[in-house]
Curated annotation (Swiss-Prot):
It comes from Escherichia coli. Residues 275-285 have a biased composition (Acidic residues). Residues 286-305 have a biased composition (Basic and acidic residues). One of its GO terms (molecular function) is identical protein binding. The gene is korB. Signal peptide: none annotated. This is Transcriptional repressor protein KorB. The keyword Methyltransferase does not apply. Keywords: DNA-binding, Plasmid, Repressor, Transcription, Transcription regulation.
Amino acid sequence: MTAAQAKTTKKNTAAAAQEAAGAAQPSGLGLDSIGDLSSLLDAPAASQGGSGPIELDLDLIDEDPHQPRTADNPGFSPESIAEIGATIKERGVKSPISVRENQEQPGRYIINHGARRYRGSKWAGKKSIPAFIDNDYNEADQVIENLQRNELTPREIADFIGRELAKGKKKGDIAKEIGKSPAFITQHVTLLDLPEKIADAFNTGRVRDVTVVNELVTAFKKRPEEVEAWLDDDTQEITRGTVKLLREFLDEKGRDPNTVDAFNGQTDAERDAEAGDGQDGEDGDQDGKDAKEKGAKEPDPDKLKKAIVQVEHDERPARLILNRRPPAEGYAWLKYEDDGQEFEANLADVKLVALIEG
C-alpha cells in the first residue's frame, strides 16, 4: 500500500466513524423519540386530534345482540341490505358508524349504531369501515338514534319500553329519556298486552298505526264481542276512519237513553217518544202533550245540561272524559278532538281552555 492509499483509507474510516457518531446523537428536533415509524403502518388511521373516525377491520366488529331493531325489521331485509350494499360498493361508506370497545373481548368492538352500513359493507366485499369509538353509549341512545331516523317499528319501541318498565323505571322517566311525550309511551305500552284478535291484526300487518290499535283496544273494553266480529271480516279495512265509525256505532248502540244529545238537546228516550207519538195519531199527540205539561220544569239558567271541559294537550285540542276513572292521582282520561283518540295523561301536561255546555 502506498502512502497516498493509506491516507485515503484513514480519511474514509474517520468519515465513517463521524457519520456513525452523528447518527447516534439526538437530532435536536425530537424525532428520536418516535422510534420505528414502520410500527405505525399497521395501526388504524385516526384523524388529526384523535377525535375523528378510524378505519376498523370488519372482522373485529360485532353487532349488538341487544339492539332495539329485530331481525324482521324492514331495514334488515335482504333487499334493503343489497340496496345499501350496492351504494357502498360504488361510493364507499360516507357516514362512519359508531362502536364501543367490547369489554368482554379486548381488541374487538360492538356496534352502537350503523348495523345496516356494517352489513352493507360486508355485502359489498369491503374489508374495513370508518368508525367512531364511543364507549359512553347505552340502549336508550340506540332507541333515540333510530327514532330520529324512523327506523324502529312500533313493536320494537314497545319492547324497549317494556324492558325499561321491568327495570323499575316510570313511564314519565322513560318519556324524558327518549324525548317523547307520556302519551307516546302509554300508547306503545298498550301493544305489550293486546287482546288476541287485535294482536293478530297487528302482528299480521293488517293494522300498523299505533293510534288505531289503541282505539280498537278502547272499543274492545266496552264491546269485545262486536269488535271481534268486526275484525273477523278479513275484507274489513282497518284505518282511523273505519275505526272511528265503528266506535261511533258502538257508542250509539250502548248509549244511556237518558243521555242528552249535544246537537238537539234531547235524550234518546224523548226522541223515541216523539217518534212514537207521531205514529199514534191525534190521541197519542194529546197524551204526549199532557204528560209533558205535567212533568215539565223550568230549566235552571245557572246549570249546564252537559258540561264539556275543553283542554289542550301536546298542542292539540282535547276534552276531559269525566265518566272514566283516572289510573292515579294527578292523571285523567282525555279525548282528542281531531281524531277521537282516548288516552290517559298527566294533568301537569294539560292546559285548561274552556268550560262549555254540550
